[in-house]
Amino acid sequence: MKKIPILLLLTACWSLAAAQEKPQTPAAQKRKPRTEIIAADSTGELLAQLRNMPNIEIGKGITFRPKNDWFELTMRFRMQNLLALSFDDDFTLTKTEARVKRLRLRFDGYIYSPKLVYSVQLGFTSYDTEPLPGGDMNIVRDAIVYYVPNATWNIGFGQTKIKANRARINSSSALQFVDRSIVNSEFNLDRDFGFFGEYNMRHGEGFNLSAKGSVTLGEGRNWGSSPTGGLAYTGRLELYPLGRFKSKGDVIEGNYEFEERVKILLAGAYSYNHKASRLKGQRGAVMPGDATRNMGSYFVDFILEYRGFAFYTDFMGRSCSDPLFSPETGAFVYNGQGLNVQTSYLFNKKWEIALRNSTLFPDSEVQPLAGYRNWNQTTLGITRYIIGHSLKVQADMSYNTRSRSIHPDYNRWEIRFQLELGL
């Protein structure tokens, strides 16, 4: 692994050799700058000073750690530049989208003890900072502190992703398509503020499991307060019958790590949002007339990876006993289900081809407001990995069909191109 400290060590050795050839005057010896790292009196001092310099690795950020190890800070950034073209059924261009879709800055590490871990993530594009009702800022994505007593348990307090469905748990930097599916876009729970806990049973290549849960405000990220008094309760169980994936491959789409043995994940989750005030629970517009609803969301995931081949399927849905509001508002809670299936193959850790089919099935009572009986989207994607998921180029093409659509002139085709760069 190539590291910047190696270059610093070579520079230091050269400078020491030069210093021996040219003796310093007494006046010059008094003018030693405090920041000079190449005038160490011994090899031990030099190595200690180099140890305090930041460590830079592509894909793993810039890490600072003092010699007393009382804290660690890793800084990362990433950006996604997107070009998307939409076409109608006659393949006439109807929309052009060209923008920086995501621009994120992330800080991770520990303070005081490696058992006290923190994570902060900020988003700066319009896609990341959708305005909240009341004008609250929406830049902060993650701001959480974890207590990690050992590799089995951890508990966190703050704002982060709700561990519900696999596609949402995955980072948007680790996708094998330009973006997540239409099913995930409708039903995911995104982020919230509250308490989070995890239990991870690890038994080598044998059976493993993880249990994750949270109690959160139920209103989504950066909401601040809830006048309803309701909370959201979420639990997820993950089973690994053949052992865990390499390098957290279960939260990275595709089989980039090239599993030598078959690896499988079967997971399920349920979330109950009591007195939610937004149409999608932790997301969406505010319900009209200060109304609230109780919502249940359910998720089932399956993953199989083996020697460059990957297969995923996600089933998820939402239930609400009273999804409709006054007709003049046009507001409704999207009751229904969605199914996503995708498969891919990786060639020589450079090229990947992937196919995805996603379908939304709104319940009959909300179909008139959703505008269709079901919505199917098929996507073909190609990815060129240059430095893994840290530097890659992606392109995909989607075709949409909506049965009994109220608006028959919807966009049928979509072609997208995206460049991702991260440190």
Language-model regions, residue ranges each:
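Detector for outer-membrane/organellar transmembrane beta-barrel domains
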Residues: 228, 238-242, 246-363
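C-terminal hydrophobic structural anchor segments
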Residues: 341-393
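Bacterial Sec-dependent N-terminal signal peptides
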Residues: 1-25
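Outer-membrane beta-barrel "beta-signal"
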Residues: 233-244, 382-386, 391, 410-423
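Outer membrane beta-barrel
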Residues: 61-87, 92-221, 227-243, 339-347, ...
